[in-house]
Amino acid sequence: MSKICKLIEAENPMMRVRLSGCSSDLDRNDVEEKLFDSMKHYNGIGLSANQIGIMERVFVMYSDVKKRETITCFNPKIVTQSDTKILMDEGCLTYPGLWLKVKRPDGIEVEYEDKNGEIQNQAMFGLECRIFLHEYDHMEGTNFTQKVSKIKLNRALKRRSKMVKRSKLVENQ
């Protein structure tokens, strides 16, 4: 049975809270299933628990987008990160239709617990690294709109607004 959860709106104060560690009585299998089903339903490549109203330090992501392989990261930590940064487009399920060029490290070493509580250590690069950092930010109470200047954000919001207006015109024809 599918466990799709509704996405929390960007303005919701829950999206600005830094999440502490996972509760000791957390049903990790249930949370993982809700995250994965919701991420798939909304066509995402990553999803943090607070984006669906679960205030626990956990997210799910595709570790290999092409192969559709996923990992679930409970209590994740960034151990080290590359000094080299790369500028790439990013979107977010919390901000549908908004794309921003965000500069992030091109490589990181991370540590997280899997659903069985086992510690996993992993090096990540490229898109996998970007997804991890994006979802990690959600748990820190920040998001990708805070990674760009106000001018760039306002331009992107105007572009998104124009796209929404155009799509409504097409729907009404």
Predicted regions and their residues:
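Positively charged
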Residues: 1-173
